[in-house]
Every structure is written in structure tokens, then in C-alpha cells.
Amino acid sequence: MKTALLLEKLEGQLATLRQRCAPVSQFATLSARFDRHLFQTRATTLQACLDEAGDNLAALRHAVEQQQLPQVAWLAEHLAAQLEAIAREASAWSLREWDSAPPKIARWQRKRIQHQDFERRLREMVAERRARLARVTDLVEQQTLHREVEAYEARLARCRHALEKIENRLARLTR
């Protein structure tokens, strides 16, 4: 009974932290947030740390059910340390301005958004031309639409290639 109450309390703390961290949980930082012994994840978002803490809570529940006392003790201590670290990080988030993305990264993120918009518009144009091609019966117009579809597909391929390069560049910059 006592164990069940403690598990519920840990679950409540995790839920509270998830709500408290929700506004900033997806923001990545340039440097690691925590020591490697505390969190195994390489991601620099609070969401990844919250997910890992949730996984550890599930592992703790399983260990309690299996009555694996040494594992229960270690997992409980580790989970408590993780929750405490996340709470400290959530409290200190406003002080992390020095770790925000530099202008160079922001510029690449804008380029990514712009290229994603280009990709979406090109897909729409290809779909629209294909729909018109399916309805047209005139041979000359079919050939014209077919050339347009090929041209838009080539543009789409170049756009996707550029988007992939931008994603790779952002990945390198945020390592």
C-alpha cells in the first residue's frame, strides 16, 4: 500500500512537471542540459528528458510488481534525482537566454520553413496539373500539361534536396 502511494506521488510530480514545462519543452539548447549519468538521452529538449523520466517510472512500476528490491531502490532514487533536475531546469529556464539559438541558426531555421512552404506549394501544383491532365482530351494540351508536371516534379526534387541540405546543416549547427 505504501509503495502504491509513493508511485502515485511520483506520477503526480511527473504530471505536474509536464504541465509546468509544456511551454518550453520543445526548445532545444546548444549544450547538454544534464549530466550523462542522470539522463541517457542525447536530445537537448526538456520533452526528451520528461519522456525518459516517464520510461523510468514505468520501469519502476514493473520492478515493484516483480519485487526486484535492489532495482526498485536504484530506480526510485534515480527517478527522484531526474524529477528534481527537471524541476530546477524549469525554474531556471528564463536565465538560459545565453543558450538560445544564435542568429546563424535562426537564419537556417527560417530557410527551412521557407523551403517547406515551397515544397508544399509545388506538391499542390503537381497535384493540380495531374488532375487537369486526367480530365483533358486534347493531345496538344495533354503534352503541355505533361511537360508542366515533369518540370514541377524536377523543381520539387531540387526543393527536397535543398531542404535535406538545410536539415543537415541545422543538425551540424545544433550538435
Curated annotation (Swiss-Prot):
Keywords: DNA replication, DNA-binding, Primosome. The keyword 4Fe-4S does not apply. One of its GO terms (biological process) is replication fork processing. InterPro entries: PriB/PriC_sf (IPR038338), Primosomal_replicat_PriB/PriC (IPR010890). It holds the Pfam family PriC. Disruption phenotype: Called priC303, no visible growth phenotype. Resumption of DNA synthesis after arrest of DNA replication (upon UV treatment) is slower than wild-type, no change in survival after UV treatment. Double priB-priC deletion is synthetically lethal, causes a drastic reduction in cell growth and/or viability. Double priA-priC deletion is synthetically lethal. One of its GO terms (cellular component) is primosome complex. GO terms for molecular function: DNA binding. NCBIfam families: PRK10093.1 (NF007500). Monomer. Oligomerizes in the absence of DNA. Component of the replication restart primosome, which is composed of PriA, PriB, PriC, DnaB and DnaT; DnaG primase associates transiently with this complex. Interacts with the C-terminus of SSB; this interaction is required for DnaB loading onto substrate replication forks. Interacts with DnaB alone and in the DnaB-DnaC complex, probably 1:1 binding with DnaB. The N-terminus weakly binds single-stranded (ss)DNA. The C-terminus (residues 96-175) binds ssDNA as well as full-length protein. Involved in the restart of stalled replication forks, which reloads the replicative helicase (DnaB) on sites other than the origin of replication. Recognizes abandoned replication forks and remodels DNA single-stranded binding protein (SSB) on ssDNA to uncover a loading site for DnaB. There are several restart pathways, the PriA-PriC pathway is a minor restart pathway. Also part of the minor PriC-Rep pathway for restart of stalled replication forks, which has a different substrate specificity than PriA. priB and priC have redundant roles in the cell. Belongs to the PriC family. This is Replication restart protein PriC. It comes from Escherichia coli (strain K12). The gene is priC.
